Amino acid sequence: MNKFDFNNRTAVITGGGQGFGLDIAKRFLDSGAKVIIWDIDEKLLKSAATEVNNENLSYNVVDVSNYSQIEQNINQITSKTNIDILINNAGITGPTMPLWEYDIEIWNKIVKINLLGTFNCCRAIVPNMIANNYGRIVNVASVAGKDGNANASAYSSGKAGAPALPEL
């Protein structure tokens, strides 16, 4: 298989309802993959499915900070097919302000989605990949995670963790 031939492969893309996640989904579809996009916003997912209009695209409403939702969706998917590829793209930016002004609930929400969500998806999907002796994971990060941003510390901290997760 050449590196851009994903026929007979299934990709799950988090944060796939719009933007970069949807663009990634389109590229995988163009390369022959079956694609399942996850997002917390059902309206975005429906709009994405209408825009793409491809029988190999499906979607599920999933909050990546909720491990039981992820497990349910994975069990549903793996009862029909393997999950070969995971693109952890889900993320939110939140408000820009100095660290000491952040409300702890807002901070926690951002980190739960941007870091815990990535961990949750890896933790839940990797056993399926191991059992099938194939799997590829891409954790989408940000330059803000590398360089930091004094006024977006929750976002920067959450995104810094994605590449720090160990290679599987």
Positions of PLM-derived features:
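Canonical Rossmann dinucleotide-binding motif of NAD(H)/NADP(H)-dependent dehydrogenases/reductases
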Residues: 3-35
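Conserved NAD(P)H cofactor-binding loop of Rossmann-fold oxidoreductase domains
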Residues: 90-95
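Residue(s) in the substrate-gating loop at a strand-loop-helix junction
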Residues: 142
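Substrate-binding pocket helix/loop in short-chain dehydrogenase/reductase
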Residues: 97-99, 106-108
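Active-site helix of classical SDR
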Residues: 122, 158
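The beta1-alpha1 cofactor-binding region of Rossmann-like NAD(H)/NADP(H)-dependent oxidoreductases
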Residues: 42-43, 61-72, 104
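Active-site loop immediately N-terminal to the catalytic Tyr-X3-Lys motif
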Residues: 100, 147-153
